[in-house]
Amino acid sequence: DIKKGHVSMTDESHFEVGLNVGTSEGAVVFENEIFQLIEYKPLTEKVHERPFLMIPACINKFYILDLQPDNSMVRFAVEQGHRTFILSWRNPDAEMAHMTWDDYIETGIITAMQKVLEISGAKKLNVLGFCVGGTMLATALAVLAARRKQLAHSATFLTCLMDFSNPGVLGLFIDEAFVRWREMQFAQGGLLPAGDLLNTFSFLRPNELVWNYVVDNYLKGETPRPFDLLYWNSDSTNLPGPWYAWYLRNTYLENKLMQPGATIVCGQQIDFGKLKLPVYLYGSREDHIVPIEGAYASTHVLESCDKRFVMGASGHIAGVINPLKKNKRSYWTNDDLPSSITQWIQGATEHAGSWWADWAGWLKPLSGEQRAPRKPGNTKYKAIEPAPGRYVKERAV
């Protein structure tokens, strides 16, 4: 634990990425200095013609969406007949210490979207963003809208903030002095160590994610049991310092992304109000990182979009990763979008089981006709290596 810099939450020796987590079959079909693009092997006789791209948070590894076959959202999407791709962020090293928010939007998300369209031959794709991956996706879509380009046919946003006026517990730690210190620290580049992120998120829930394990591991001498989700939680990543400093100031501190024209990204003024596409917004009721009020606020930020908002039980991760087959927990729907989440909940209907069923029903008619599947990649973009690729296996030192 001293060497790792954090208290062990699970028996990490039980897991290996690509062996028993992140095991969905597929291939890396494109890579650059920021990400690898993975396309998954079809599991159905026919697939929808419009491809589907998943964008996870760059502050974690992508395999939270592909833990094991029985709780993999990736596998669920593939089983629904979607030609599924995912963006696997590289764990930043010294070569990436200068990378900015603009780099992640342009060379990351926008490039990934373009490559998916080139590989599939489609004109538009369906795209999903999770946590800060959703915030970055909304930014990328706004950049494209300013350029009068629309690559996305629909967008799904899972537990993400666009309006940071209600950022939850994290907002208590961020003020002008803290942000200015980080900006000075990373003015010439540098990396935010993975351990800093891991410990920050752990101490947001100290009784559950710190002291519980201190007592069991150190006082009782017990060995933590294997748990795939906690293994992923411990497999944190570094972040480029300039990216991190920009994110702190323009979201948590000044909430500038939601102010039309207040922020310039990739040479374009950001205006979420110019986005015009069907969107599915999901928030978790007990989320301590993206409060349900903050998740719901996106319904009013995306004022020109055809929107559906759904609330699930549980928290930031467990609420999202709630496989349909296990029939656990519940979710709420309401076709109306009143001004507050309190009003929305009052008019909502509770459903037993996973919200995945509702989302699948929403996405299917947006995915086009079905046709015979193809192997991952094409003649130009051939398989580089099997999924999950080597980027996700790079551990933070």
Label every PLM stretch briefly.
Residues 1-20, 341, 345-356, 363-397:
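N-terminal targeting or regulatory segments adjacent to alpha/beta-hydrolase or S9 domains
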Residues 275, 281-283, 287:
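Short beta-strand/loop motif that positions the catalytic acidic residue
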Residues 248, 298, 302-338:
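Catalytic histidine neighborhood in serine/cysteine hydrolases
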Residues 118, 122, 136, 140-244, ...:
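Alpha/beta-hydrolase-fold enzymes
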Residues 129-137:
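Gly/Ala-rich beta-loop-alpha elbow adjacent to hydrolase catalytic centers
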Residues 288-294:
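Conserved alpha/beta-hydrolase "acid-adjacent" motif
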Residues 4-94:
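Short, surface-exposed "cap/lid" segments of acyl-processing enzymes
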Residues 96-120:
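Alpha/beta-hydrolase active-site loop
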